[in-house]
Amino acid sequence: MAPSRKRGGGRAAAASSARREWKVGDLVLAKVKGFPAWPAVVDEPEKWGHSADSKKVTVHFFGTQQIAFCNHGDVESFTEEKKQSLLTRRHAKGSDFVRAVKEITESYEKLKQQDQASGPKYAEETTAGSSGNTSQLPQACENLIGSRLDTQIESSSSHGRDELTLLSEDASAAEQMLALRHNTLAHNGACDSAAAKDLCEIATYSSRRRNERVRALKYAPQSIILPVEHSKISSRLELDRVQRSMLQCSDGGPSVNSINGKAIRRRKRIRTSGQSESDDVVSSDLNLHGSDEDNASEIATVESNNNSRNEGNGVDSGSKVEYSDAVGEGCDGGHELNKGLDFHISTMVKRKKRKPTRKRETSDIIDPPAKVEAEGLGPNACDSCQRSQNSHERLNERPCEENGDEHLPLVKRARVRMSRAFYADEKVNASSQVEERSSKDTLLSAALQTSPSVNHENGIGSGHDTSAAEEFNSFELSAKLSGVMVDVVPSHMEKPSDRMSPSVACVQTVGDRQTAVNFHENEFTMTLDDEVTRAQSNQLSSLVETEARVPEVVQGCSEESQTGNCLISETDPIDIQCSHQSEKHETPLNPDIVDSSANKSPGLCSSLDMTTTVVPAQSPHQHKIQEYDSSDHSLVIVGDSLNGKCEKIDYCMTQVVQSQALEPPPPLFCSVVNYQEVENLQETENTLWKENQGSPGKELDSDKQAHMIQNPVLSATESEMIVDDAEPQYETVYSHCADAVENRELEKSCEVDEQKEQMQATNSISVSENFSREKLNSSPARGTPNCNSVCRISTAESENAMQNNSYYSTNVQYGENKSLNVDTVKEESKVETGTTQVKKVVSSDVQCTVESFETALDSLVRTKETIGRATRLAMDLAKFGVSAKAMEILAHTLESESNLQRRVDLFFLVDSIAQCSKGLNGDAGGVYLSSIQAMLPRLLTAAVPAGATTQENRKQCLKVLRLWLERRILPESIVRHHIRELDSLSNVPACLYSRRSARTERALDDPVRDMEGILVDEYGSNSTLQLHGFCIPPILRDEDEGSDSDGGDFESVTPEHESRSLEEHVTPSITERHTRILEDVDGELEMEDVAPPWEGGSSASAITDQADNRESANCLLVPGTSHQNVTSSSPPARPSQNAQLAMSNSYSNGFDYRRNPSMQGDYHAGPPRMNPPMHYGSPEPSYSSRVSLSKSMPRGEGSNFQHRPYPSSHPPPPPPSHHYSYMEPDHHIKSRREGLSYPHRSHYTLEFDERNYQDSYERMRPEPCENRDNWRYHPPSSHGPRYHDRHKGPHQSSSYSGHHRDSGRLQNNRWSDSPRAYNNRHSYHYKQHSEGPVPVGMRDPGTWHQR
């Protein structure tokens, strides 16, 4: 027999076969126990402080910040099939898994694109580029340019072209440019480097063009600059670029080497950075273009340090970032700047095609300014932008240096980088942030200044183009915003070529500030029609659009001047805003500003910082000034202050003006712009509002547009930068920062109390959200920077700040919408997320999580799965910093829920969240606990509303609170307080409820506690529920059946036996319930029939009569009738029934047998019938009342005495049939059951103690009956039997005429006064003043055994 194979050998073989050499960065699916195969990336264990293990694969999971060391068999490669599989089943796995799938899918697509870009085509290009001759480089450049032009034209003409092909073309072009640069570096060809720069620009713009195709119409002016929509524009653009490149080649600079080296590094980064790099690029590009969806594929901005996400960086757009890099690299000279710019553009590589599902609002305006900057950025702008570029490069470099977190999910990566960026290069961040915020007005002036300065410094070629394009964009945007746009539109449409010509003119008139301004106006006019209409229609809101455009203008102008410096562009927008304000207020102010900005462009960076600081400082004044010009300034203000309010907008304008006034001394570009602007603005500050109201329409409109353009730029990248570096910006800025912060805070306090809380960071976040809300929310890449800002907030646990930010941004959008309703409508239609985005200024992940949480609340049921899922979503929201919002949603849902049971379910969810939070460490655990503690009264009020129908809810909530008390979820004092409140609500009077209080709910000293099984109430009976039975016995006729058989065996029952039998029959029939009560009378057990005579008393009465008949063997009046008749006729009674009947009899016959020897004889004749006595209402009176009846009875008569009428003036009637003779037992029982009237009741009524036997009926009522007292004491008049004939009514003072019932009962009891109807069957031996009733044995007729 072959040896059995070792179990598990197959597994080992599979593992060994699956083992492979994983490389760092490989995308895999890693299986960990308890989790599905999770998307992950192979990582280096050394990076995490672990040693390498060949048996384990170190993976870093997407969607989390966790790593694991998995066996080779648990790791499988991520393929296209796996991707499809994950996409189909990701939704049921939780938000983390969905995010992980999304991230790995994006990374996978990016890697595919990179592979395509680095394929054989790239190798060929590299080989061709590496040819030894430098002279080949220009030709190659020309070829590339031609091919790129063709490609651009083709792409513009065929929008449906495969996106992957476009990506590959762009990537190949970029690689070619890199190779060309490399060759040039080897051959030291300056012209070649210039050509490479142009090629890079072409490649970048071509990819951008594709990205912008969707929004090309919006950016007609920009499309002129960049080949986006029309082949003509593209061709012109390319030709212009070629010309510039040729000029640059002639100017040729030796900086190509450095550029090439950087290009090589960047290219390497592009290939190795992985998803984070691509994401960063995408985010920057998205910021530039406004949305990933529209761009299907994004250009990856591969800066030396910007590979990763451009979070804290001032990368509002890919082109802008590129320029800042280029400037940083080529700031040594104009040629270097151009080359660096080109190189940076070449580093731009399309990474991936974004999912259209990612909803992002595209700010097309942003892209054109960036493109304009890219084209127009000339070497001239290099010097002026160096400072800001350096800071910007540092910002960009920071993410690259921090690439170690590329494996993290977008949100978490953004959080990490935000934290790093927050502490690193705070000055740079602050500058960029401030620039972005205050760059609205400054942007126009900065653009004008930058372009002239670029022209002067760098040369007519690229410098003019850049300045012209920038100015053109600024004017275009301004015109778009203003009504002048209409005028400009026809000219723009008519002269598409004029677009380029204005730039040429601008180049020619490099030194002419007015020429540049005019050029900008011309360009604006030319492009106004397409760009204004499309941009406005596509912008989220008019104000948002204006803001976006203003930042774009800032980017275009400032980027031209600062090129690679997002900070500069941000700062420039501030200056531009100031100049625009001046322009709006004063027409001549624009040219002056342009001149000053052009002259002072070199100081752009520092000026930006100054301007940034100054803007806040000036905000109060400007705010006042701009209140009048809210429509124009509101656009600018929104971008600057980020507050999202018209007041803030005004404040921003004021800030711009003031900042200019404060900053005239600094020589930097901003200060230069501010210099003349300050002079003009200072003058205009007083007249600003007047001029704003009545300033030249075109200029004001242009200013508005410029401001709007600036705002969009801020929304894309500046907003992100602001969010990340809002606080550092103020710190970074000069001493003005403090003033700016203070001013900003003051403005916030005036404008919004919430803004006070958020302060600078809040403002920056608001701006980014306001301008790029849709973009950031919709685009994953852009979302990352936004997430960074948001994450920072969440990391700081400023949930209120986030909410305030969203509120502000919403306000900003609303304010902007108010200023431009039409634009707002278009914006809303464009915004896919719509109301959700307006309500939530958070990342798309946070928004999705909030929506999922709301859905989970709607579908919540009392199951572990649904409550656990909602709890996990709540924990996710706490990670995002919106736990307060989650609790508010939960409380609102709880309050609005109409189903009481679902309210308990929701409160159980609160319990789940609280317990889950208790298990968390750090601040995350205390967030929800503090919220729950604060909202607990509200939650309990909603879960347990007032009313008797919420007892179940109250019990469940008490259980939860006691559990919290036991586990110390919340402070003990608070929990106990709420428990006491709920307990007090539980102690509702019993009268409100139909049921009797449970045994455990009664007081310890309550005698009824011991009688739980007897079904009696505080008054000795349970007749409360069957009160009608006394008056209408037929109702219980059927129920009484079976009780008549109680007359069978009359076996005397001891208290122990009786109680035991009663316990065995806890639920006797209704009649029995009413007929027996146990009362405690002086420690003795006494039976008393308290039930209505006709319903419950029928059976008991039969037994009683039988017993009485036994006792009354010597019945004088009715000798013929004996208990034997009854006994024989009636079936034997069950022991329990007998016991109960005996009890009732003992109660009814509660006479002091000690005084009645005959009764004693009866008692001894049979076993004593005793039950555990039970107080009937007030026990003493009831017992005394019973005993009182016997006071007038002769003792010596024994049973005969019992049957004798009670001594009274009216002796009982002689006829035995009427008096004491029993009817035939059947008849007797039947008559009693049927409640037949007894004609001779009156006979007994007179002799019996005539305390209304209705009182005994009354005893059945809930309130304590004092009729028992009447039983003891004879009332002066008799009102008839206590239990009257059912047919005759409850109160009959006539004779007790039920000879059936009465005869049997009165044979034993012989009362002249009719006893209680049901008591008649029991022999009542009353003594006048017996001290208490005594149990009576009714088995032995005629004898009482006295104790």
Swiss-Prot record:
Its main location: nucleus. GO terms for biological process: flower development; mRNA processing. It comes from the Eukaryota. Residues 127-137, 1181-1191 have a biased composition (Polar residues). Gene3D superfamilies: 1.25.40.90, 2.30.30.140. Coiled coil: none annotated. Disruption phenotype: No visible phenotype under normal growth conditions, but the triple mutant plants hulk1, hulk2 and hulk3 show delayed flowering. It is found in: Nucleus. Residues 110-137, 251-320, 383-402, 1037-1069, 1121-1140, 1147-1223, 1259-1347 are annotated as: Disordered. Residues 24-81 form the PWWP domain. Transmembrane segments: none annotated. Residues 390-402, 1054-1069, 1259-1272 have a biased composition (Basic and acidic residues). Expressed throughout young primordia, and vegetative and reproductive apices. This is Protein HUA2-LIKE 3. It comes from Arabidopsis thaliana (Mouse-ear cress).
